[in-house]
Structures are given as C-alpha cells and as structure tokens.
Amino acid sequence: MTSENVVEAWRESAQYWAKHSDTIRKMFMPLTRALVEHAGNHEGQAVLDIAEGAGEPSLTIADVVGPGGSVTCTDAVQEMVETARSEAQRRDITNVRFQQCTADSLPFPSDSFDVVVSRLGAMFFPDPVAAACEMLRVTKPNGCLALAVWHKSELNPFCHVVTGVIDRHINPGAADPDAPNAFRFAEPGKLAGVMTEAGASDVKEQVVKFNIEAPISALEFWSMRSQISDTLRDKLAKLSAGEQAQITSEVEQAVQEFFPANQMRFPAQMIIVTGKKP
C-alpha cells in the first residue's frame, strides 16, 4: 500500500476523529503518559510527533517541554493537522508548529530533534523501515525514537469484542499480517526488529497495561468506534439498515461487562519500542 492509499483511507476518518477528539484523548492518556516517560521527554526539548491524529500526544508533550521547548506536530492527512491546530488554538498552546507530511519523507534537516515519537501510527506506515530511517535521520545523535503500537487483538477487548460481532455477519477474509493495520506490530519483537534494521541502537521493548476509560455509554462507544474506523465504515456500508441495527444491538450486549455504571473501562495492552540514534 502506498502513502497515497493510506492518506486517502484516513482522510474520510478525519472528521470523526475531530468529532470524538476529547473522548479519544481521555481514552489514550495513560498511553500518552507512558510514551512521554519512555521517550524521556523533559523541559526544553525539541520533539517531533509523527501521525498525530487529532493532536495527541503533541499537545500533552508541549506542556512537558514547556515554553523553552517545542513540538512539531505532523500527520499525513491535512485535515488531521487542521484539527490539531484548532485544538492548540482553543487551549492557547503556543509552542507547537504544524506540518502535513508522511513519515517516510520528512521535510526537516537531519539532526533536528531531541526526541521523535509516534503513538499508534507506525502500524499504518506503508514502508516501516523507510519511515524509521527517516525518523532517525532527523533525530539528533544520541536522541530517542519512541513508538507505541497495539499489542495482540486478543489482549484488547476494545477491538476484539467488536471484531467478533462483525465477523459473524461479514466474512473477514484472509488478512495480510504485513499490510497496514492496527495489529501489524502486535507480535513482540517485530517493531523492535524494524527499528534495529533502520539503524537504531539500544533498542528496547516494553508492554504497557492500562485501562481505556471515558465517560461514555456502550451505545456512544459503538457510535464512536463505527465512525472513526474506515474499515468498520466500509464493512457496515455493505449491510442493510436492519443488519446494521442488529449489529448495534449485538455490540451493546457484547461490551456490557466493560461499562460498569455506564462508563467505559476496557483493559488494554500496548507495546512501546524505543531506540537511540547512534
């Protein structure tokens, strides 16, 4: 899959990521904090965020690095960049700049950033090794590259419970494990191997466990999930209104245990891989 294909797939999702940006920020804040910790973010740093989605972790890191530091917030989709820019303006965050670009062709000089991060973006890079090489190129010597990705589907009911319902109605077909998808790097060691191949040193891998939480109901969860995922939107579009209503009912029932007191709480596991630029 080319960069153009990936961009087109995400372009339609951008409006929904903007719509649900506050919920998404809350859902993944524990992962954002873990990424900040493993990346060694601190005051005064220059940080590059790749595939920022609707503005995170860029806007959180901006607070960590403070006025003496800076964050460059990038995404392959211009609409995502504009959502992040609007959120920064709303929150009066001034130490962030914004740039539309792809991970495998970064428009920055070599040795520009103390830290380069990507939260839940690396799985969708058309050429992960080329992207990792580019990210290392723009990192300063001895600087850190830190990438967060989903662990295995079966460890993440936020995903697999929904998939289980959908697959009862639509044949999922054969999946290419190396094609851009959420669980492309779910196997421990796979992303670390990419980073090593790209030339990183001191490559380390850590499993992060947390709860995906937000003050939303099961029905609101399904509304969000079915909108922000281009894969789900495409599958649901093939079904009749009656079939879609049946899936909604089945998803609500299937996720009930993860909504105590009508509040979302899914256990989750992610993988964070870090490496240094020699």
Language model features with spans:
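Conserved class I S-adenosyl-L-methionine
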Residues: 1-45, 56-60, 83, 90, ...
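A generic alpha-to-beta junction signature in SAM-dependent methyltransferases
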Residues: 39-41, 65, 139
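A short acidic, Gly/Pro-enriched loop at the edge of an enzyme's catalytic core
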Residues: 104-115
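Conserved hydrophobic residues forming the short capping helix/wall of the S-adenosyl-L-methionine
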Residues: 65, 87-88, 166, 195, ...
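A short SAM/SAH-binding and catalytic strip from SAM-dependent methyltransferases
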Residues: 114-128, 151
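Conserved catalytic/acceptor-binding region of the Class I
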Residues: 129-130, 136, 140, 144-216, ...
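Class I SAM-dependent methyltransferase SAM/SAH-binding core
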Residues: 46-106, 130
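Conserved Class I S-adenosyl-L-methionine
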Residues: 3-6, 10, 20-21, 25-28, ...
